[in-house]
Amino acid sequence: MRKVAKLIGISLLALGLAACDGETKDTKAATDGAAASAPAGQQVSLLDGKLAFTLPVGMADQSGKLGNQANNMHVYADSTGQRAVIVILGDKTADSLETLAKRLENTQRARDANLQVITNKALDVNGVPLRQLDSIITSGGEKAYSSVLIGSLNNNMLTIQVTLPADNQQQAQTEAEGIISTLKLKQ
């Protein structure tokens, strides 16, 4: 599962670096009516409160081990590393959110021919347009549920990835939606 976490981290980093050349504009924003219940856990606040969400019980800040303030990567994971939330802030891009999501999907597909895309949709969180790409990825014979949110916040490109074991896809999807439903953004 460490390989999956590394693969996901590298994919997100590559996406962030590939999209460092302009301003993101996307006019296709939909409201996400996810009815997933919010998990009880630790409240996380970044960018002076402009980005906040709730971690599920059992996850803790691992940024000192895998990321730091200098590289704008924040990592929250459980003790096994199988359940993780990764937040990356990068430079804005001129590419649309749809283009960025498609590029991410193509990158994941190049690494995993068996990639299963569950969702690729537009959503809106507190007036901030985002793109959500949910998929099942396989690495080292293990499957993981990945939910990636891409958007623009505070003159940064924002990428949030929730990774969970995909042994039970419905449970993983519900837990990911629960985390996403706690997301609060302020421009």
What are these regions (language model features)?
Residues 56, 97-105, 147, 173-180:
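Extracytoplasmic/secreted envelope proteins and their assembly/folding machinery
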